[in-house]
């Protein structure tokens, strides 16, 4: 019996002890071995929390000692939200979490120490940690431990708020010169004991300015933290849509955000950048709300070809064809004119279909090194546009914008008003010598008269304000509404906008409707997708003529005699036969009011572009991405180049009525498919970031056009009404295959070295010359942390770069290929086949090459109130593709050769000063 009682006592003791050990093991997260089963593998809790921070882009604050040695066995790829992950990870650990902000969480023990009241004079528990130890990475607390200390004579408390006045959790409060400190709670409250009135409290948080406050006779100290803009890690969207830290870039870039674009809203989003970016020239052609923006980055690189930068939206290139700059029939060219010669109008460009309110950021990659990963298409720089994909804050938001602008014609003329209309010192006294253009007549005298082209005698006196008298004030009215959502998993943005414009030319109107959808979601911690789709419809009626062209409104007005009354031209634009009344002996000057009423051009364009990208993280430092994007537009237009009855046209044959009418249908499609593999890992103070990818670009464009003349019925502009018809069908296809890669090495997050390489294979060149390889190398050094500048220098960086790119952009899809067609000219009554075109193919034609070197530096001073960005660059373009005339005996007229060479060099400087900056007002110059 005694033995039985002894065994029972021993057994109970063992069971009780085992039970206690099991509880301790569960609380600590350690494994328990059971008979017949293998031990379970647990993950370190602190590593799991670090992974959550990176995956969900949140901050999780905790004391190291409370998570030290704790384990978890949860599968890290199975969480759909931060809250779900923390709930699972903290099970059985004796810890809990509190959500202290939008993306901020605090982990603490379930039974926290009692917090003393402000009036308590008893011994209290305070946090003690080294004075040099701050929050690591903006989230975790290191070296904080609870220690029992002696009674303090003064007890201080208060509330800490952020820049918006909200409670700020996780702020370090340190008693200067000691290891005594505290941390603000979820509401921003804190309590700390100090030694005397001379004690100094230091309030600190990563990304915010440290504040030191002398206690004095205060018992409550409230503090508002200020953002340290000098330490903000600016992220820049670079080539291929890769996001990189701005300080790591060894080349010049400029980024403009949506709030800067909205200050000066313009129908064409690029015009809002005028004067904002150094080294970039942006000029509107003054051709109305649907007009083209001429963009040049660091000058011209091609002598005879196109010099437009590549436009990239959300990582995928889109077409930016300019309609109206130069005549041509190739829809894949950078600029397209109208058939019939002369009277070219500005029909807009690809950027005009983008609603400025949909743009989140615009980044300009200026040099060859910045754009090298885009290869041949980026020889003139790249403009990266990122559109909105979610709400700014969590939840659902609706934004409505109403924008109105007024445009007035710019009258920069400075005419003389001493002598009037006429020639050789004689004013018009009969209709015949009326010049209508020259003001070389007699000197103005009171009571003098002149005879105009209509035979009417009017006063011989100055006519002022011709420009403002003819043109009107333009108006632009934009209504846009956006529905956006945002959550822990992602968000979306859906917008609709309607732009109605009236140009300064009385018969010019423009309407644009756009729908934009952007979205980005994390399906799991490892798998995410994002996409963007944009649809636009444009109606452009009678876009103004551009340039120095005969028979156009601008030329007629600016060359008009200074005593020609506008009302006479308006009321007498037709003669007795219904033709234009000749007001000038110069036949290339058309009455501007005749042009308004009898010449027309109608343009309709529908466009849809977008892309979708899928990204999967194989590990926390390695991901793969696949993306496909498409840009498609259709453009229909009809116009009459020379209205029937125009005085500048030769007399029509008997039975015919003169004039030219054209109908055109253009279709364009470009598909880009690419993949990208990225590895980004740190080895102590050394960081490695490697990218490898490839792209396939396929482009197709076609043109259906018919031009008719010799109308049966005058002023009836239809294809059926023209006796002579000239149809055209033009098809262009081209493709480029590419492989590319980049590698970046960083040391101490201060020294950066980056190299890139890309190889393109062009379909437009011969097999021997279609492959071209172009490299780039860049370096930067962030030096301000190594200098003792007593706080006046917030940021300093030196950078240098060199790159080479090539291009086949000046080679037409088939201009270097011999092909045959059926000629319109008949021989013996039969159509004849033969070589199509007058350009002799050159099998040795090579892509043009551009080598560019640049050095520069960036400075930010006095709490970012003064910033300076300077760059020096030299760009050498060789093997330019030009057209050379050859002997007619060859059967051709010209051939393309590599001959041209040009050099661009310059200095760029952007100085930004913020003289006044308050909570409600900022003045930046």
Residue ranges and their predicted role:
Residues 308, 512, 518-527, 532-537, ...:
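Extracellular/periplasmic, surface-exposed regions of secreted and cell-surface proteins
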Residues 1-516, 521-523, 528-530, 609:
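Short, small/polar-rich motifs associated with maturation and membrane association
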Residues 284, 292-295, 545, 785-797:
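Short, surface-exposed recognition loops and adjoining beta-strand edges that mediate ligand/DNA contacts
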Residues 242-249, 454-461, 585-589, 646-648, ...:
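Flexible hinge/switch segments at interdomain interfaces of large molecular machines
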